[in-house]
């Protein structure tokens, strides 16, 4: 069977606090581990999406509205719905693993790195679909 949930694939979370949020898979673990004995993925997603920006707004207001609030999480495969989209995040691939979640300082440092990467991606104008909220 072909593997659908690969690193770089964009998915939607279907259950829990982040239900309806878009995530990108950073690491897929099919067999499970000791702490999570089921197929799961380490994901990074957008908790708060950037707001709409117009030409008439000033630079300070645009900067404030262009912020992205990310989250990182270990999610069961059953709670992920893959999409046809992919997002290239080369600098995050090896940085965030399942071990990152063991210590709060590592977790917050990883979240800051994800925030920086997401904001760079958003500013470049690429992957606009990923940075818009899902309408349902």
Swiss-Prot record:
Keywords: Cytoplasm, Nucleus, Ribonucleoprotein, Ribosomal protein. InterPro entries: KOW (IPR005824), Ribosomal_eL27 (IPR001141), Ribosomal_eL27_CS (IPR018262), Ribosomal_eL27_KOW (IPR041991), Ribosomal_eL27_sf (IPR038655), Translation_prot_SH3-like_sf (IPR008991). Disulfide bonds: none annotated. The keyword Nucleus applies. It is found in: Cytoplasm; Nucleus. GO terms for biological process: cytoplasmic translation. One of its GO terms (molecular function) is structural constituent of ribosome. It holds the Pfam family KOW. GO terms for cellular component: cytosol; cytosolic large ribosomal subunit; nucleus; preribosome. Component of the large ribosomal subunit (LSU). Mature yeast ribosomes consist of a small (40S) and a large (60S) subunit. The 40S small subunit contains 1 molecule of ribosomal RNA (18S rRNA) and at least 33 different proteins. The large 60S subunit contains 3 rRNA molecules (25S, 5.8S and 5S rRNA) and at least 46 different proteins. Component of the ribosome, a large ribonucleoprotein complex responsible for the synthesis of proteins in the cell. The small ribosomal subunit (SSU) binds messenger RNAs (mRNAs) and translates the encoded message by selecting cognate aminoacyl-transfer RNA (tRNA) molecules. The large subunit (LSU) contains the ribosomal catalytic site termed the peptidyl transferase center (PTC), which catalyzes the formation of peptide bonds, thereby polymerizing the amino acids delivered by tRNAs into a polypeptide chain. Belongs to the eukaryotic ribosomal protein eL27 family. There are 2 genes for eL27 in S.pombe. This is Large ribosomal subunit protein eL27A.
